[in-house]
Amino acid sequence: MDMTNAQRLILSNQYYLMSQLTPENEAKYRRLQTIVERGYGLQMRELDKDFGCLPEDACRNIIDYMEMHHALQESYKMLDDASQSQVEPRRLQFLGFDAATESQQVHYVRFLTEEEGLYPQFDKSEHQFNSQVQMQDKYQRMLQTWRNCPRQYHLSSSEITQILSA
Protein backbone atom coordinates (compact mmCIF):
# COMPACT_ATOMS: atom_id res chain seq x y z
CA MET A 1 0.00 0.00 0.00
CA ASP A 2 1.53 3.29 -1.08
CA MET A 3 0.66 6.26 1.11
CA THR A 4 2.02 9.74 1.41
CA ASN A 5 3.37 10.88 4.76
CA ALA A 6 0.23 12.98 5.24
CA GLN A 7 -1.99 9.93 4.64
CA ARG A 8 0.11 7.88 7.04
CA LEU A 9 -0.23 10.59 9.69
CA ILE A 10 -4.01 10.70 9.25
CA LEU A 11 -4.27 6.90 9.47
CA SER A 12 -1.96 6.82 12.49
CA ASN A 13 -4.20 9.35 14.24
CA GLN A 14 -7.27 7.29 13.38
CA TYR A 15 -5.69 4.18 14.88
CA TYR A 16 -4.81 6.19 17.99
CA LEU A 17 -8.42 7.36 18.32
CA MET A 18 -9.72 3.81 17.79
CA SER A 19 -7.40 2.56 20.53
CA GLN A 20 -8.90 5.13 22.89
CA LEU A 21 -12.50 4.45 21.87
CA THR A 22 -12.27 0.67 22.06
CA PRO A 23 -10.06 -0.33 24.97
CA GLU A 24 -10.71 -4.02 24.31
CA ASN A 25 -8.91 -3.63 20.95
CA GLU A 26 -6.24 -1.18 22.12
CA ALA A 27 -3.30 -3.52 21.50
CA LYS A 28 -4.47 -4.23 17.94
CA TYR A 29 -4.82 -0.53 17.08
CA ARG A 30 -1.52 0.41 18.75
CA ARG A 31 0.22 -2.24 16.66
CA LEU A 32 -1.36 -0.92 13.46
CA GLN A 33 -0.46 2.63 14.46
CA THR A 34 3.19 1.62 14.88
CA ILE A 35 3.21 -0.15 11.50
CA VAL A 36 1.82 2.93 9.76
CA GLU A 37 4.06 5.42 11.56
CA ARG A 38 7.23 3.48 10.84
CA GLY A 39 6.19 2.40 7.35
CA TYR A 40 6.91 -1.32 7.68
CA GLY A 41 6.21 -2.41 4.11
CA LEU A 42 5.57 -6.08 4.79
CA GLN A 43 3.10 -5.39 7.57
CA MET A 44 1.50 -2.51 5.67
CA ARG A 45 0.05 -5.13 3.33
CA GLU A 46 -2.11 -6.26 6.26
CA LEU A 47 -3.88 -2.93 6.16
CA ASP A 48 -5.28 -3.42 2.69
CA LYS A 49 -5.94 -7.17 2.76
CA ASP A 50 -9.65 -6.64 3.38
CA PHE A 51 -9.94 -3.90 0.80
CA GLY A 52 -10.63 -5.17 -2.63
CA CYS A 53 -12.90 -4.95 -5.54
CA LEU A 54 -15.19 -7.72 -6.61
CA PRO A 55 -16.60 -6.82 -10.05
CA GLU A 56 -20.32 -7.11 -10.72
CA ASP A 57 -19.95 -10.19 -12.94
CA ALA A 58 -17.98 -11.99 -10.20
CA CYS A 59 -20.74 -11.15 -7.70
CA ARG A 60 -23.37 -12.49 -10.09
CA ASN A 61 -21.37 -15.70 -10.58
CA ILE A 62 -21.19 -16.26 -6.83
CA ILE A 63 -24.93 -15.74 -6.51
CA ASP A 64 -25.42 -18.20 -9.38
CA TYR A 65 -23.24 -20.78 -7.58
CA MET A 66 -25.27 -20.33 -4.41
CA GLU A 67 -28.56 -20.51 -6.30
CA MET A 68 -27.40 -23.69 -8.01
CA HIS A 69 -26.67 -25.25 -4.61
CA HIS A 70 -30.09 -24.13 -3.40
CA ALA A 71 -31.66 -25.83 -6.44
CA LEU A 72 -29.65 -29.00 -5.77
CA GLN A 73 -30.82 -29.09 -2.16
CA GLU A 74 -34.46 -28.43 -3.02
CA SER A 75 -34.43 -30.99 -5.83
CA TYR A 76 -32.95 -33.56 -3.46
CA LYS A 77 -35.80 -32.95 -0.98
CA MET A 78 -38.35 -33.68 -3.74
CA LEU A 79 -36.81 -37.04 -4.65
CA ASP A 80 -38.32 -40.27 -3.37
CA ASP A 81 -36.31 -42.32 -0.87
CA ALA A 82 -34.89 -44.66 -3.51
CA SER A 83 -33.62 -41.75 -5.59
CA GLN A 84 -32.27 -39.94 -2.52
CA SER A 85 -30.21 -43.00 -1.64
CA GLN A 86 -28.26 -42.52 -4.89
CA VAL A 87 -26.99 -39.08 -3.77
CA GLU A 88 -24.67 -38.38 -0.83
CA PRO A 89 -26.45 -35.52 1.03
CA ARG A 90 -23.25 -33.97 2.39
CA ARG A 91 -22.12 -33.28 -1.19
CA LEU A 92 -25.06 -30.90 -1.57
CA GLN A 93 -23.63 -28.54 1.03
CA PHE A 94 -22.32 -25.21 -0.25
CA LEU A 95 -18.74 -25.15 1.01
CA GLY A 96 -17.81 -21.61 0.01
CA PHE A 97 -14.36 -20.69 -1.26
CA ASP A 98 -10.73 -20.95 -0.21
CA ALA A 99 -9.94 -18.09 2.17
CA ALA A 100 -6.25 -18.19 1.25
CA THR A 101 -6.69 -17.75 -2.50
CA GLU A 102 -10.33 -16.67 -2.93
CA SER A 103 -10.74 -14.35 0.06
CA GLN A 104 -12.87 -11.76 -1.73
CA GLN A 105 -15.34 -14.49 -2.67
CA VAL A 106 -15.42 -15.81 0.92
CA HIS A 107 -16.13 -12.30 2.23
CA TYR A 108 -18.90 -11.81 -0.33
CA VAL A 109 -20.58 -15.11 0.60
CA ARG A 110 -20.41 -14.14 4.27
CA PHE A 111 -21.88 -10.73 3.42
CA LEU A 112 -24.75 -12.32 1.50
CA THR A 113 -25.57 -14.83 4.24
CA GLU A 114 -24.95 -12.70 7.33
CA GLU A 115 -25.75 -9.12 6.31
CA GLU A 116 -28.25 -9.69 3.51
CA GLY A 117 -29.86 -12.75 5.13
CA LEU A 118 -29.78 -14.78 1.91
CA TYR A 119 -29.61 -18.57 1.85
CA PRO A 120 -30.24 -19.14 5.58
CA GLN A 121 -30.45 -22.88 4.87
CA PHE A 122 -26.73 -23.03 4.05
CA ASP A 123 -24.73 -24.52 6.89
CA LYS A 124 -21.84 -22.22 7.80
CA SER A 125 -20.27 -24.95 9.94
CA GLU A 126 -17.10 -24.13 11.82
CA HIS A 127 -15.36 -23.03 8.63
CA GLN A 128 -17.63 -20.05 7.87
CA PHE A 129 -17.67 -20.79 4.12
CA ASN A 130 -13.90 -21.35 3.97
CA SER A 131 -13.65 -24.50 1.87
CA GLN A 132 -9.86 -24.58 2.37
CA VAL A 133 -9.48 -25.63 -1.26
CA GLN A 134 -10.01 -23.58 -4.44
CA MET A 135 -13.58 -23.95 -5.66
CA GLN A 136 -14.06 -21.38 -8.43
CA ASP A 137 -13.25 -23.75 -11.31
CA LYS A 138 -15.31 -26.59 -9.80
CA TYR A 139 -18.34 -24.32 -9.33
CA GLN A 140 -18.00 -23.04 -12.90
CA ARG A 141 -18.08 -26.59 -14.29
CA MET A 142 -21.04 -27.45 -12.06
CA LEU A 143 -22.89 -24.31 -13.14
CA GLN A 144 -22.43 -25.12 -16.82
CA THR A 145 -23.83 -28.62 -16.28
CA TRP A 146 -26.74 -27.26 -14.21
CA ARG A 147 -27.64 -24.70 -16.86
CA ASN A 148 -27.88 -27.49 -19.44
CA CYS A 149 -30.57 -29.25 -17.40
CA PRO A 150 -34.10 -28.61 -18.71
CA ARG A 151 -35.71 -28.31 -15.26
CA GLN A 152 -33.15 -26.65 -13.02
CA TYR A 153 -35.26 -26.75 -9.86
CA HIS A 154 -36.68 -30.25 -10.36
CA LEU A 155 -33.54 -32.28 -10.94
CA SER A 156 -33.43 -36.06 -11.03
CA SER A 157 -30.91 -37.98 -8.94
CA SER A 158 -28.82 -38.64 -12.06
CA GLU A 159 -28.80 -34.93 -12.95
CA ILE A 160 -27.78 -34.06 -9.38
CA THR A 161 -24.96 -36.61 -9.56
CA GLN A 162 -23.85 -35.24 -12.95
CA ILE A 163 -23.70 -31.70 -11.59
CA LEU A 164 -21.82 -32.73 -8.45
CA SER A 165 -19.34 -34.73 -10.53
CA ALA A 166 -18.67 -31.95 -13.06
UniProtKB/Swiss-Prot annotation:
InterPro entries hit by this protein: UPF0304_YfbU (IPR005587), YfbU_alpha-helical_sf (IPR023146), YfbU_helix-hairpin_sf (IPR023145)
Any Pfam family hit: YfbU
Gene3D superfamilies xref list: Helix hairpin bin (1.10.287.680), yfbu gene product, domain 2 (1.10.3190.10)
Lineage top rank: taxon: Bacteria
NCBIfam families in the cross-refs: PRK05445.1
Family: Belongs to the UPF0304 family.
Protein name (Swiss-Prot/TrEMBL): UPF0304 protein PBPRA2768
